[in-house]
């Protein structure tokens, strides 16, 4: 009977041990399944966060694309207007050049006519001089009235010749000026043609950015010069004020050091200059202050406050100028970046239908589920 009971107990122990092992295995399986489930949940959250990030990136890219398209349209409109203006300027300069050429031809014709007139007048003067030199052998019946009339005619012709010579000199001067203006206009037309070709071809040698940078630099230097002048004036005023204060302090020190009726050397003289001395003076109990000392301290504190306010105003003005300069530089850099991207064929912007978002397969399957 006991042997049977022992056998049953052993059998029950074996079964209990086997059940414990099975229970441990099931527990391990459940723990592993829980870990796998938690890991899957974490992966699901990470994929969801990645999907949200990609969606935000897509929205931001779309907004940036819209801004770039708007900037490109503005640049196209501005380029069209600038091109039209340059074409109109070139046409106007061509017309002016043609007008100058016609004026030059007219001046040349006038010069030729004046040369012919001068030649005619020289021949007339020479003939008259020959006739005058042959006066002693002329006929005896020539009268004195004929000589007077010939002299008057000769004087008139000489005055007219001098007037024509002066007109010729003035015409030659006008011709030289017109030639200089024509050469200057030709150089200007050539320069504008080069600038137009640079602008049309997108050449980096175009002068638009350089002019803008020069104008901005000039504005910045002008503001800086005004600030320096204001600071110089404020420094001069401060120096004059401190000079007056030093003179007043010296006078007050001399008065306090002089002997007074009813007072000895028990009360020391007070001369306050800076904040450190003011603090030490107010903190010390060995010095007795009167109403005049408090007034002097108040005046010095007020002057210090005014100086601080003036320095703060100057620093704010300088910061404002620097901020404007920084804003201009940033805007110029942005415009240059957009121009370089739009001008180079390697940075052509894709169309709306060519933009695709590459999403991993795992993310796509998770989002579809």
UniProtKB/Swiss-Prot annotation:
InterPro entries: Coiled-coil_dom-contain_pr_149. The keyword Coiled coil applies. Signal peptide: none annotated. It is found in: Cell projection, Cilium. Residues 1-249 form a coiled coil. Transmembrane segments: none annotated. Keywords: Cell projection, Cilium, Coiled coil. Expressed in amphid and phasmid ciliated neurons, and also pharyngeal, touch receptor and motor neurons. One of its GO terms (cellular component) is ciliary base. Belongs to the CCDC149 family. PANTHER family: COILED-COIL DOMAIN-CONTAINING PROTEIN 149. This is Coiled-coil domain-containing protein 149. The lineage of its organism: Eukaryota, Metazoa, Ecdysozoa, Nematoda, Chromadorea.
């Amino acid at each position: 009977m006991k042997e049977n009971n022992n056998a049953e107990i052993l059998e029950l122990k074996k079964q209990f041990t086997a059940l414990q092992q099975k229970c441990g295995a099931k527990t391990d399986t459940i723990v592993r399944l829980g870990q796998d489930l938690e890991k899957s949940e974490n992966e699901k959250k990470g994929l969801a966060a990645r999907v949200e990030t990609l969606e935000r990136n897509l929205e931001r890219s779309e907004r940036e694309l819209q801004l770039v398209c708007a900037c490109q349209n503005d640049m196209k409109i501005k380029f069209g207007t600038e091109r039209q203006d340059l074409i109109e300027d070139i046409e106007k300069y061509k017309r002016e050049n043609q007008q100058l050429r016609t004026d030059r031809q007219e001046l040349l014709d006038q010069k030729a006519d004046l040369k012919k007139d001068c030649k005619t007048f020289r021949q007339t003067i020479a003939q008259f001089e020959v006739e005058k030199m042959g006066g002693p052998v002329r006929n005896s019946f020539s009268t004195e009235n004929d000589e007077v009339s010939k002299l008057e005619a000769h004087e008139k012709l000489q005055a007219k010749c001098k007037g024509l010579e002066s007109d010729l000199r003035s015409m030659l001067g006008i011709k030289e000026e017109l030639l200089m203006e024509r050469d200057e206009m030709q150089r200007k037309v050539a320069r504008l043609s080069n600038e137009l070709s640079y602008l049309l071809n997108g050449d980096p040698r175009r002068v638009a950015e350089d002019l803008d940078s020069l104008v901005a630099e000039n504005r910045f230097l002008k503001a800086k010069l005004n600030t320096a002048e204001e600071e110089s004036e404020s420094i001069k005023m401060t120096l004059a004020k401190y000079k007056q204060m030093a003179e007043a302090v010296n006078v007050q020190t001399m008065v306090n050091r002089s002997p007074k009726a009813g007072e000895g050397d028990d009360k020391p003289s007070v001369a306050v200059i800076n904040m450190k001395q003011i603090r030490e003076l107010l903190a010390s109990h060995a010095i007795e202050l009167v109403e005049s000392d408090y007034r002097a301290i108040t005046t010095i504190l007020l002057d210090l406050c005014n100086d601080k306010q003036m320095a703060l105003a100057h620093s704010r003005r300088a910061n404002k100028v620097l901020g404007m300069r920084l804003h201009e530089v940033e805007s110029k850099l942005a415009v240059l970046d957009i121009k370089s991207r739009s001008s180079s064929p390697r940075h052509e912007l894709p169309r709306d239908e060519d933009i695709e978002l590459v999403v991993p397969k795992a993310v796509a399957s998770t989002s579809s589920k």
